[in-house]
């Protein structure tokens, strides 16, 4: 039985968007690897943008149908960079039961192990659903902060939480909540709260999410907001939210979700995540995928998983979808708000993946060296296809990714990353010239 400190996977909860059964020994191998990670490794392997992806990698390969060898490969590919989990300060853990003491430590990465011990105790007593609801969705001052913290760090806290909930592993939920509480801030909470205030004060424009992305693309100040910064967090914190806070808030606040329309708006958000990931390219260069955009797709699966939970209220579900789309607009702007050109995806001709269907692509992805980003993206696209499909017919540009485009984007992700070193797999800010220097022009490749 899975507990707040012990991993115990079940074939009944082996991941959504599957195309095959679990191979012999896969569940047992995954249990061992995940327990090792839980017991030995820190959630952060460096102070900034250094998230431990081992849990994501192992569980995604399990969902893709990988066996013991593929699971071990996924674990080994990212094990060397991990660092040991720090010792727990029991006095601090006791103090975390006081809301003010808890609040004073939010956003401090060095408090991860203390938060992990605290949430493990809470879950052991109350169950993970009650603890998530209390600490993220109850509306208390601290819960509002942690709700927003789910979207910090390029969505990694909500991604980790969704893995714990999807696979029904209380110990992974405890890891996620500890990450949520200890993650440093890029200013996402203030942005989201400002959006909510703006939404209550202004009329609903009725603009679709695609239209809002195109509005960002057309806004010169937003397009240039992130210029001059070297990394994603700085582009968000100091660029988009620092230089153009009023403009991005006014834009993002226009995306609103009624609790009666969650499924439609969820599908719209998922579809648009795929749209910005595949349709943003650079003229004269081979197709590539932006590292930050791909996380909008991966996190869209995470929001879908949370929306599926009957114990989460419709009001919270609406907010989860609403906030995700608003943060997507921030990240699109932080990569330069590059022109969205759907033919760049629709006209793509697969190379290494030519002729593959989803099952074949799953097998190929499970076998290649990867730190988890490719595998998570491909599974999220397969799931997104199913969620979006009922709403695509007659939707026009509101749902730009339709039919074969879902598989084609997954093939593009595989083709452009397979057998490449990590620094050459993705574009780390697709709108900035310096990030394309390692990519030969199309003329140079002829």
Curated annotation (Swiss-Prot):
Pathway the protein acts in: Secondary metabolite biosynthesis
Described function: Questin oxidase; part of the gene cluster that mediates the biosynthesis of geodin, an intermediate in the biosynthesis of other natural products. The pathway begins with the synthesis of atrochrysone thioester by the polyketide synthase (PKS) gedC. The atrochrysone carboxyl ACP thioesterase gedB then breaks the thioester bond and releases the atrochrysone carboxylic acid from gedC. The atrochrysone carboxylic acid is then converted to atrochrysone which is further transformed into emodinanthrone.
Name the UniProt record assigns to this protein: Questin oxidase
Source organism: Aspergillus terreus (strain NIH 2624 / FGSC A1156)
InterPro entries: Questin_oxidase-like
Taxonomic lineage of the native organism: Eukaryota, Fungi, Dikarya, Ascomycota, Pezizomycotina
Signal peptide, first to last residue: none
EC number in record: 1.14.13.43
GO MF entries: questin monooxygenase (NADPH) activity
Recorded superkingdom: Eukaryota
Protein family (similarity comment): Belongs to the questin oxidase family.
PANTHER family reported in the protein's UniProt record: BAEYER-VILLIGER OXIDASE MDPL, PROTEIN, PUTATIVE (AFU_ORTHOLOGUE AFUA_5G03330)-RELATED
pH-linked activity: Optimum pH is 2.5.
């Amino acid at each position: 039985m899975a507990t707040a400190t012990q991993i115990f996977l079940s074939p009944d909860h082996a991941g959504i968007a599957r195309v095959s059964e679990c191979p012999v020994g896969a569940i047992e191998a995954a249990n061992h690897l995940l327990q090792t990670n839980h017991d030995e490794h820190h959630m952060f392997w460096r102070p900034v943008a250094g998230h431990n992806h081992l849990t994501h990698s192992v569980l995604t390969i399990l969902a893709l149908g990988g066996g013991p060898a593929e699971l071990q490969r996924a674990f080994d590919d990212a094990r060397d960079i991990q660092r040991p989990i720090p010792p727990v300060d029991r006095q601090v853990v006791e103090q975390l039961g006081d809301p003010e003491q808890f609040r004073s430590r939010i956003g401090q990465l060095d408090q991860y192990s203390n938060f992990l011990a605290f949430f493990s105790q809470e879950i052991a007593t109350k169950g993970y659903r009650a603890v998530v609801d209390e600490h993220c969705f109850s509306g208390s001052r601290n819960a509002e902060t942690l709700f927003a913290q789910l979207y910090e760090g390029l969505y990694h806290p909500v991604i980790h939480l969704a893995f714990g909930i999807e696979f029904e592993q209380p110990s992974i939920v405890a890891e996620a909540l500890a990450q949520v509480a200890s993650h440093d801030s890029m200013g996402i909470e203030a942005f989201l709260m400002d959006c909510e205030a703006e939404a209550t004060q202004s009329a609903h424009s009725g603009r679709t999410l695609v239209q809002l992305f195109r509005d960002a693309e057309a806004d010169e100040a937003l397009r240039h907001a992130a210029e001059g910064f070297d990394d994603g967090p700085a582009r968000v914190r100091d660029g988009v939210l620092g230089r153009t806070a009023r403009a991005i808030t006014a834009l993002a606040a226009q995306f609103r979700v009624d609790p009666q329309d969650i499924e439609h708006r969820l599908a719209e958000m998922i579809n648009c995540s795929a749209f910005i990931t595949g349709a943003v390219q650079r003229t004269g260069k081979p197709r590539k995928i932006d590292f930050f955009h791909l996380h909008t797709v991966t996190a869209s699966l995470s929001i879908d998983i949370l929306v599926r939970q009957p114990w989460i209220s419709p009001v919270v579900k609406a907010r989860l979808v609403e906030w995700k789309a608003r943060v997507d607009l921030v990240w699109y702007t932080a990569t330069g708000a590059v022109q969205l050109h759907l033919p760049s995806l629709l006209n793509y001709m697969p190379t290494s993946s030519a002729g593959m269907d989803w099952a074949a692509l799953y097998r190929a992805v499970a076998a290649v060296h990867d730190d988890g980003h490719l595998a998570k993206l491909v599974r999220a696209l397969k799931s997104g296809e199913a969620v979006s499909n009922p709403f695509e017919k007659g939707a026009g540009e509101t749902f730009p990714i339709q039919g074969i485009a879902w598989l084609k984007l997954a093939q593009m992700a595989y083709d452009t990353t397979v057998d490449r070193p990590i620094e050459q797999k993705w574009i780390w800010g697709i709108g900035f010239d310096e990030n394309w220097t390692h990519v030969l022009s199309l003329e140079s490749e002829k």
